[in-house]
Protein backbone atom coordinates (compact mmCIF):
# COMPACT_ATOMS: atom_id res chain seq x y z
CA UNK A 1 0.00 0.00 0.00
CA UNK A 2 1.26 3.46 -0.85
CA UNK A 3 2.08 5.97 1.83
CA UNK A 4 -0.51 8.34 0.38
CA UNK A 5 -3.28 5.75 0.89
CA UNK A 6 -2.09 4.88 4.40
CA UNK A 7 -2.80 8.40 5.63
CA UNK A 8 -6.54 7.94 5.20
CA UNK A 9 -6.80 4.73 7.22
CA UNK A 10 -8.14 5.17 10.72
CA UNK A 11 -6.36 3.39 13.55
CA UNK A 12 -8.38 0.49 14.93
CA UNK A 13 -9.78 1.02 18.41
CA UNK A 14 -9.94 -1.89 20.77
CA UNK A 15 -13.52 -2.72 21.70
CA UNK A 16 -14.12 -3.36 25.37
CA UNK A 17 -17.25 -5.33 26.08
CA UNK A 18 -19.29 -3.90 28.92
CA UNK A 19 -20.48 -6.22 31.60
CA UNK A 20 -24.21 -6.92 31.56
CA UNK A 21 -26.12 -5.07 34.31
CA UNK A 22 -27.86 -8.29 35.39
CA UNK A 23 -25.65 -11.20 36.34
CA UNK A 24 -26.51 -14.83 35.78
CA UNK A 25 -27.24 -15.34 39.49
CA UNK A 26 -29.58 -12.33 39.86
CA UNK A 27 -33.25 -13.21 40.11
CA UNK A 28 -35.59 -10.71 38.48
CA UNK A 29 -38.40 -10.51 41.01
CA UNK A 30 -40.68 -7.80 42.38
CA UNK A 31 -39.21 -8.36 45.87
CA UNK A 32 -35.63 -7.69 44.73
CA UNK A 33 -35.78 -3.92 45.22
CA UNK A 34 -32.03 -3.34 44.93
CA UNK A 35 -32.09 -4.80 41.42
CA UNK A 36 -35.32 -3.14 40.31
CA UNK A 37 -34.34 0.33 41.51
CA UNK A 38 -31.37 0.39 39.11
CA UNK A 39 -33.75 0.36 36.13
CA UNK A 40 -36.00 3.24 37.23
CA UNK A 41 -35.33 6.91 36.52
CA UNK A 42 -35.35 9.66 39.16
CA UNK A 43 -38.93 10.44 38.18
CA UNK A 44 -40.01 6.83 38.72
CA UNK A 45 -40.21 5.89 35.04
CA UNK A 46 -38.98 2.58 33.62
CA UNK A 47 -35.78 3.16 31.66
CA UNK A 48 -35.61 1.93 28.07
CA UNK A 49 -33.84 -1.21 27.00
CA UNK A 50 -31.21 0.75 25.11
CA UNK A 51 -30.32 2.78 28.22
CA UNK A 52 -30.30 -0.31 30.45
CA UNK A 53 -28.31 -2.45 27.97
CA UNK A 54 -30.60 -5.42 28.64
CA UNK A 55 -31.75 -8.21 26.40
CA UNK A 56 -35.37 -8.25 25.26
CA UNK A 57 -36.30 -11.04 27.66
CA UNK A 58 -34.60 -9.32 30.61
CA UNK A 59 -36.33 -6.00 29.83
CA UNK A 60 -39.73 -7.73 29.74
CA UNK A 61 -39.09 -9.42 33.09
CA UNK A 62 -37.85 -6.16 34.66
CA UNK A 63 -40.94 -4.31 33.39
CA UNK A 64 -43.29 -6.94 34.80
CA UNK A 65 -41.44 -6.94 38.14
CA UNK A 66 -41.62 -3.13 38.39
CA UNK A 67 -45.33 -3.12 37.61
CA UNK A 68 -45.98 -5.84 40.20
CA UNK A 69 -44.00 -3.89 42.81
CA UNK A 70 -46.02 -0.75 42.02
CA UNK A 71 -49.33 -2.60 42.39
CA UNK A 72 -48.22 -4.09 45.71
CA UNK A 73 -47.14 -0.60 46.89
CA UNK A 74 -43.47 -1.53 47.17
CA UNK A 75 -42.64 1.16 44.60
CA UNK A 76 -44.41 4.47 44.02
CA UNK A 77 -46.02 5.06 40.63
CA UNK A 78 -44.48 8.54 40.54
CA UNK A 79 -41.53 9.96 42.40
CA UNK A 80 -42.63 13.47 43.40
CA UNK A 81 -39.81 14.32 45.82
CA UNK A 82 -38.46 17.05 43.55
CA UNK A 83 -41.86 18.76 43.29
CA UNK A 84 -42.28 18.82 47.06
CA UNK A 85 -38.85 20.38 47.51
CA UNK A 86 -39.70 23.15 45.04
CA UNK A 87 -43.07 23.83 46.67
CA UNK A 88 -41.49 24.19 50.11
CA UNK A 89 -38.95 26.71 48.88
CA UNK A 90 -41.50 28.93 47.11
CA UNK A 91 -43.31 31.27 49.48
CA UNK A 92 -46.94 31.80 48.51
CA UNK A 93 -49.05 34.73 49.57
CA UNK A 94 -52.49 33.78 50.82
CA UNK A 95 -53.85 37.30 51.39
CA UNK A 96 -56.33 39.16 49.20
CA UNK A 97 -55.14 41.94 46.98
CA UNK A 98 -56.56 45.37 47.64
CA UNK A 99 -57.55 47.62 44.78
CA UNK A 100 -56.37 51.19 44.61
CA UNK A 101 -59.24 53.64 44.07
Swiss-Prot record:
PROSITE patterns: RIBOSOMAL_S18. The lineage of its organism: Eukaryota, Viridiplantae, Streptophyta, Embryophyta, Tracheophyta. Part of the 30S ribosomal subunit. Belongs to the bacterial ribosomal protein bS18 family. HAMAP family: Ribosomal_bS18 (MF_00270). GO terms for molecular function: small ribosomal subunit rRNA binding; structural constituent of ribosome. GO terms for cellular component: chloroplast; mitochondrial small ribosomal subunit. It comes from the Eukaryota. This is Small ribosomal subunit protein bS18c. Keywords: Chloroplast, Plastid, Ribonucleoprotein, Ribosomal protein, RNA-binding, rRNA-binding. Transmembrane segments: none annotated. The gene is rps18. It is found in: Plastid, Chloroplast.
